[in-house]
Amino acid sequence: MTKTLPEDFIFGGATAAYQAEGATNTDGKGRVAWDTYLEENYWYTAEPASDFYNRYPVDLELSEKFGVNGIRISIAWSRIFPNGYGEVNPKGVEYYHKLFAECHKRHVEPFVTLHHFDTPEVLHKDGDFLNRKTIDYFVDYAEYCFKEFPEVKYWTTFNEIGPIGDGQYLVGKFPPGIKYDFEKVFQSHHNMMVAHARAVKLFKDGGYQGEIGVVHALPTKYPFDPSNPEDVRAAELEDIIHNKFILDATYLGEYSRETMEGVQHILSVNGGKLNITDEDYAILDAAKDLNDFLGINYYMSDWMRGYDGESEITHNATGDKGGSKYQLKGVGQREFDVDVPRTDWDWMIYPQGLYDQIMRVVKDYPNYHKIYITENGLGYKDEFIESEKTVHDDARIDYVRQHLNVIADAIKDGANVKGYFIWSLMDVFSWSNGYEKRYGLFYVDFETQERYPKKSAYWYKELAETKEIK
């Protein structure tokens, strides 16, 4: 039976400033840590990415034509404040006003994120969010944007607090490239949640029009053998690191006993301690019921086994299937040999995990208000067919269809899910994979910057028009 989605459902496309704009040092933009990190460590940079800085009118015209009625955009903090604070860059401000005006002209609602992995380099060098001064600078930047851009009706403080700490201090694939430092992981998560809570409270106290929330990446964690207590515990601990710690901070205004027991266990095994003040808890508590929505980014689930060795992670950045290893001291190891399809980058394709995660939020955090699926999509080595000027991306269509079906199930079962944003609107630059891993509805020729609708774009258009998942 064909499932349908609600009439008022948002069918969106997602982007991010650093992954789409290019123009990394144009019109007064300040540097971000990624500029230096990519120059020193990788064979690619974010220049020109998808040249969204200049070509946003083309992408928004395509959005309108293909039924995309919402777009996730992030403001590059260093375009507004090149150093993260102090002097404002008027050309950056003007750019975003023009961008939001074009969104509205094309009837594409902008959902705007204040921070998407791109802290200005000046602040990043000074400890990023491990330095509590960065919290103050972020809140000042947020307040400036709330005042300056009243045309924005949907604000998100952060994109993926979990993967930021994870990438910077656990896997070591984000600048500054530190590995297995759990103290920094949890402290980064916590400090960013304090920054989020302060910004949300400021937004509500200031009487700004519109809605505000946060986007969390929530990969579902399962025990490899549900009857093995070690596997069950490994899944619980992995869930605390990636999901429960930040969800508790968002909606409980504190960390539950189970969460803190898990954190203390991980820190006792690996070393380190967490600095949380009474004032922090008061800030989290004051904001816990003020989030208008939760954005969930979901791509995959993981299966965990007990493990008592040292930490070792091998990140698959090449798209050669089977190149991943993930084992953490005091936590567990991910088992990749499970009967579940996976992408070339070893991401497990498991739509049921999205359903389970949505219903977990509904059950454990009833003050969630509403949910948007703010990222979901399939990274693929797309094959461009020159004679047809398109990509036959049936695997992407199938991936999205499967995930939309479980979203429809979750809505039927009582979850208030209001929209879906495919990652990504057009092909963009990937943080740790460069330009080979493509996600877009629109194929981008990165040499010419021409856009070509993929088969998935036509499928998505019909979906947006009929609301039927075919």
From Swiss-Prot:
Q: In which pathway does it act?
A: Carbohydrate metabolism; lactose degradation; D-galactose 6-phosphate and beta-D-glucose from lactose 6-phosphate: step 1/1
| InterPro entries given in the database record | 6P-beta-galactosidase, Glyco_hydro_1, Glyco_hydro_1_AS, Glyco_hydro_1_N_CS, Glycoside_hydrolase_SF
Catalytic residues as annotated in Swiss-Prot or TrEMBL: 160 (proton donor), 375 (nucleophile)
Residue ranges that the Swiss-Prot or TrEMBL entry lists as coiled coil: none
Q: Which GO terms describe its molecular function?
A: 6-phospho-beta-galactosidase activity; beta-glucosidase activity
The top EC class is: hydrolase
Which reaction does this enzyme catalyse, per its entry? a 6-phospho-beta-D-galactoside + H2O = D-galactose 6-phosphate + an alcohol
User: Under which name does UniProt file this protein?
Assistant: 6-phospho-beta-galactosidase
The major lineage groups are: Bacteria, Bacillati, Bacillota, Bacilli, Bacillales
